[in-house]
């Protein structure tokens, strides 16, 4: 029992100890959170207002209040106070607001649409009046003009819109356009062969194909025992030719010693395809007059490539006294579709011909590549392998020199190394900056720490190693790392160097002299110290004088998160916003147009009526923003910061 009681007592004491430790940890965590909240409370007061709110200065107390914005289609009729919320009212007729706002009156709608324009969007509480040209017209030089009408033989290539005219093109081969139009494209010619018809008249760019029935001889269901029917595409008529069993007058049927051969002949002056009138056929030698009945004249007008000759086949008369039988028979022909094979239409065979041509080209390319590769394998490389290795090593050795020249800024005949400038300022923070830039490990950082005596030497070697290690190293990344570690003072020094307003110590920014200007700069090693650092006086070439330092990265350098410093050129003229920062914002806005109205709405409570009138008279939004920078920049630093906060909140791409 004593042992059991002692164990229970020990467990209770352990549980009390664990509870005390847990309570102590919870209390410590709460204290740490409270400390962090007190640290971050002061910067949070300077951050921009939350979305959906605006700042208002109470005229009675002078206190800056944060009020909720009014929704789109309304305006603030009464601002909020310490005791009441803001009051919103609907926009009156003829005014509008597109976004939630904190303005005291709505924007006026645009003027009514001039004739002949029509309204796409009417003037409403949420939208401004928008005018467009009516259908069939497009806007040109502020007026509406009718769409161009494509003439005959031309078709619409691109349909016209409200802002662009119609584009016409001449009808290609196989297409036509027979009416002037501003909406119709070229139509394809009628496929006569596909409809089992003949092309009577080929089409042009202005007319369609003229199709007709095919000419053939029908032998089914004849009207009589000796009748042949002719079909023509234009003259659908039937001509009956009497049978040869008809016994004309004056012909002796008992004459068994003579034979008659009746055949139509085509004279040299008559075009093929016509059947001349043969009224009689005489046999002068025998003295017997044999006449045939006069058949009706048949005239056929066909295309030049369809010509037919009607031939009357001869018949033999039997000597036994029977009636002679002379029948008119059509020549034996194949199926009418056989005529289609006489004409080669390239449009029908063009697709598979193109496919065959591409396959042939592909085969030729493969064969040539195989032959070339086989020759290369047989001959071997043209150069000695050792020479190739030497060239590769030379290219690698030249890379650090090019990277190093990238970071040199020429000023007053001296080459100033930006990396050395940063290394001289960051001090012991170079470790954090180097790890941020390269994602380096502690082992790599320790290598630089053991190889040099001073912090600026370690920082310079680490930054050089960063530029050589990553070819994508840029000034924007370096500035981002400096801001990440709250070294805006170094960024301002770089700005001052570019603006030529800061007196720098040239002995600290001198470049190390290399033994030979042509020898490649080796990769900085942690075990080698930088010695013999002297001032490098370099006269830049005309190309170096004309080119801008870090042309593609000037915008990130000049884009700051606070108002201007006293060293900037524009601040000396009395403005709290630097010219570089303003130009950066305006350049970005002009390159990528966006809606700037929310920025103007945020600044209305700072502008007086005269300044507001001046800004409203400017037509272009970018010019309005430029003027707004000039007006707000000379008011106060707080107003300038409010404008910058509004710009960065509504244009997040600038960050």
Curated annotation (Swiss-Prot):
Residues 371-655 are cytoplasmic. InterPro entries: DEATH-like_dom_sf, Death_dom, TNFR/NGFR_Cys_rich_reg, TNFR_21, TNFRSF21_death, TNFRSF21_N. The keyword Repeat applies. Oxidized in response to reactive oxygen species (ROS), leading to endocytosis. Keywords: Adaptive immunity, Apoptosis, Cell membrane, Disulfide bond, Glycoprotein, Immunity, Lipoprotein, Membrane, Oxidation, Palmitate, Receptor, Repeat, Signal, Transmembrane, Transmembrane helix. A lipid is attached at residue 368 (S-palmitoyl cysteine). Residues 330-339 have a biased composition (Basic residues). Pfam families: Death, TNFR_c6. One of its GO terms (cellular component) is plasma membrane. Associates with TRADD. Interacts with NGFR. Interacts with CASP8. This is Tumor necrosis factor receptor superfamily member 21. The gene is Tnfrsf21.
């Amino acid at each position: 029992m004593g042992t059991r009681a002692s164990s229970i007592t020990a467990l209770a004491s352990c549980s009390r100890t664990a509870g005390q430790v847990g309570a102590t940890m919870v209390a410590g965590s709460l204290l740490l959170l409270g400390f962090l909240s007190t640290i971050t409370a002061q910067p949070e007061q300077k951050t921009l207002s939350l979305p959906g709110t605006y700042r208002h200065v109470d005229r009675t107390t002078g206190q800056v209040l944060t009020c909720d914005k009014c929704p789109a289609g309304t305006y603030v009729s009464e601002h909020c106070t310490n005791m009441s919320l803001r009051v919103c009212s609907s926009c009156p007729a003829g005014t509008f607001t597109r976004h939630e706002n904190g303005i005291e009156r709505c924007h006026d709608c645009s003027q009514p649409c001039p004739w002949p324009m029509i309204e796409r969007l009417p003037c409403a509480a949420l939208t401004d009046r928008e005018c467009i040209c009516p259908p069939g017209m497009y806007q040109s030089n502020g007026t509406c003009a009718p769409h161009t009408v494509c003439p005959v033989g031309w078709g619409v290539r691109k349909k016209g819109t409200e802002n662009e005219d119609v584009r016409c093109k001449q009808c290609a081969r196989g297409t036509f356009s027979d009416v002037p139009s501003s909406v119709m494209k070229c139509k394809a010619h009628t496929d006569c062969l596909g409809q089992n018809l003949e092309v009577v008249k080929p089409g042009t760019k202005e007319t369609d194909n003229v199709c007709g029935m095919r000419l053939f001889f029908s032998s089914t269901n004849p009207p009589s025992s000796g009748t042949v029917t002719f079909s023509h595409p234009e003259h659908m008529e039937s001509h009956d030719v009497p049978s040869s069993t008809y016994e004309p007058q004056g012909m002796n049927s008992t004459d068994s010693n003579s034979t008659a051969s009746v055949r139509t002949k085509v004279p040299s002056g008559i075009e093929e395809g016509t059947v001349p009138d043969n009224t009689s056929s005489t046999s002068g030698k025998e003295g017997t007059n044999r006449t045939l009945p006069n058949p009706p004249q048949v005239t056929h007008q066909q295309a030049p490539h369809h010509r037919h000759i009607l031939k009357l086949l001869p018949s033999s008369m039997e000597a036994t006294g029977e009636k002679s039988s002379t029948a008119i028979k059509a020549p034996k022909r194949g199926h009418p579709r056989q005529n289609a094979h006489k004409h080669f239409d390239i449009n029908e065979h063009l697709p598979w011909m193109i496919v065959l041509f591409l396959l042939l080209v592909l085969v030729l390319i493969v064969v040539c590549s195989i032959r070339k590769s086989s020759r290369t394998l047989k001959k071997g490389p043209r150069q000695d392998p050792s020479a190739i290795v030497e060239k590769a090593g030379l290219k690698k050795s030249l890379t650090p020199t090019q990277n190093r020249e990238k970071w040199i800024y020429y000023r007053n005949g001296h080459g100033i190394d930006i990396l050395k400038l940063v290394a001289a300022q960051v001090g012991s923070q170079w470790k954090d900056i180097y790890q941020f830039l390269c994602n380096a490990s502690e082992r790599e950082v320790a290598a630089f720490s053991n190889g040099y005596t001073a912090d600026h030497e370690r920082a310079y070697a680490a930054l050089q190693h960063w530029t050589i290690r990553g070819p994508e190293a840029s000034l924007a990344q370096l500035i981002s790392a400096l801001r990440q570690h709250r070294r805006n003072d170094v960024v301002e020094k770089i700005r001052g160097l570019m603006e030529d307003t800061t007196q720098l110590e040239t002995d600290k920014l001198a470049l190390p002299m290399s033994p030979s200007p042509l020898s490649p700069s080796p990769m900085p090693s942690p075990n080698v110290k930088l010695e013999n650092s002297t001032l490098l006086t370099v006269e830049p070439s005309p190309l170096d004088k004309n080119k801008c330092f870090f042309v593609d990265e000037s915008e990130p350098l000049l884009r700051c998160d606070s108002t201007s410093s006293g060293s900037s050129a524009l601040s000396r003229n009395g403005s709290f916003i630097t010219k570089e920062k303003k130009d950066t914002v305006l350049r970005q806005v002009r390159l990528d147009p966006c809606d700037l109205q929310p920025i103007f709405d945020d600044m209305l409570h700072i502008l007086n009526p005269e300044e507001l009138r001046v800004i409203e008279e400017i037509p272009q939004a970018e010019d309005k923003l430029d003027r707004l920078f000039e007006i707000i920049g000379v008011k106060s630093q707080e107003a300038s910061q409010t404008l910058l906060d509004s710009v960065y909140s509504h244009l997040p791409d600038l960050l």
